[in-house]
Amino acid sequence: FAAMKATALNLPIDNSLGFAYVLPYKDNKKGITVAQFQLGYKGVKQLALRSGSFATIPNATDVRDGELISRNRLTGECKFNFIEDAEEREKKPVIGFVSYFKLLNGAESTFYMSKAEMEKHALRYSQTYRSANPKVKAASKWTTDFNDMACKTVVKLNLSKNAPLSVEMQDALKADQSIM
C-alpha cells in the first residue's frame, strides 16, 4: 500500500529524486516489519506547486548563529539578517530552521523551529533516531541528513498549519510516515 500511495500522488519512488520513499518500519507490538510511506522534501514542494496557490514555492533553510533577529511566538513573525558570504556563514553553528511561502492572494507565512525543538521532534517521531542500538541510530536519516530532514519538517509543518491545502496535499501529509 505504501508504493500505491506514492503512485496515487504521482510521486516517483527513487531515493536519488527525493519525492517519496517506502521504508521498512519495525512494528514492535506485532513483531513484524512493514512498509512505511514517507513523503520526501521534493514531494512536499511538488504537491504545493501543483496546487497552483503559491506565488513562491515553499522553501526552507537553516538559520545560523546571529541571523535570527526576533521571533514573535504569537504571530509567527520572524526577522532574520542572513549572512551573505557562504564561507563566513558555514563557520557559524546552526541554531534553527525556517520555512517561508507566499500565496497568490498575498498571504505569507514564516515558520521557525530552533535546533533544540527540531531535535525533540526527531526523537518523538523517528523510531530509528531514538533507537538505543547505535547502528540503527547511525543509519537514521535524522542522523545522516539532519539538516535536510529539518528543512522538510519546517516546510511540512508550515504548510499543514498555515496554507490552504489541496485534497492531494492533505492526503499526502496525512499519509506521510504512516504504516500501510
Go through each PLM region and give its residues:
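Single-stranded nucleic-acid nicking/binding segments centered on His-rich, glycine/basic loops
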Residues: 153, 163-180
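Binding-interface segments
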Residues: 1-165
